[in-house]
């Protein structure tokens, strides 16, 4: 039977220690988030003991370093599957997981502002593109501050034709939408606050 390992509130050093400890034992990162102040970022992760394609991960890197890691991974045939970020837009730090073996189409962006559906490079435009072109969010995150929110996302081809929707709303409205959709046999797939 596969084992799961999870932790939260881990420092970058503790997260790296767990990475070195769990990876050789056959565990894979299946969830990863970074939060808090960039000078003392905290990590939460879920590790699943199971086989799968080759994978790699990065954490504690700035936007330029993330872009380099992303470009290198894509050149090597890895697709992004998890992204998380914390901190102000201009000095955020990122954590991400990349995996080989994703033969269907995907796209990813970070540093997006909210914007309108016709505003190239905005989060709303990316979500509309995904919906219109048959993609589904694989991983989404919000970072920045209330006056300058930024978004990062990874979208993969929706090969299973899974119905999906997305909301950027206050908690009371979200709860009403959640209750209605759960009543219709849907479940949350991605949530970020």
Describe these PLM feature segments.
Residues 1-193:
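Terminus-proximal functional modules
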């Amino acid at each position: 039977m596969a084992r799961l390992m999870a932790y939260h509130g881990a420092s970058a050093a503790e997260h790296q220690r767990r990475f070195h400890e769990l990876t050789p034992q056959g565990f894979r990162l299946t969830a990863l988030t970074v939060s808090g102040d960039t000078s003392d970022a905290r990590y939460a992760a879920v590790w699943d003991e199971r086989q799968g394609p080759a994978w790699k991960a990065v954490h504690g890197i700035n936007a330029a370093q993330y872009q380099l890691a992303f470009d290198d991974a894509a050149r090597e045939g890895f697709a992004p599957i998890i992204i998380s970020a914390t901190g102000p837009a201009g000095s955020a730090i990122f954590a991400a997981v990349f995996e080989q073996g994703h033969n269907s189409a995907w796209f990813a962006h970070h540093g997006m502002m909210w914007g309108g559906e016709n505003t190239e490079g905005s989060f709303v435009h990316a979500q509309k593109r995904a919906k219109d072109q048959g993609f589904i969010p694989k991983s989404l995150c919000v970072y920045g501050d209330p006056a300058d929110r930024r978004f990062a996302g990874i979208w993969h081809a929706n090969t299973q034709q899974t119905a999906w929707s997305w909301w950027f709303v206050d908690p009371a409205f979200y709860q009403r939408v959640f209750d209605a959709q759960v009543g219709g046999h849907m479940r949350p797939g991605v949530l970020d606050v």
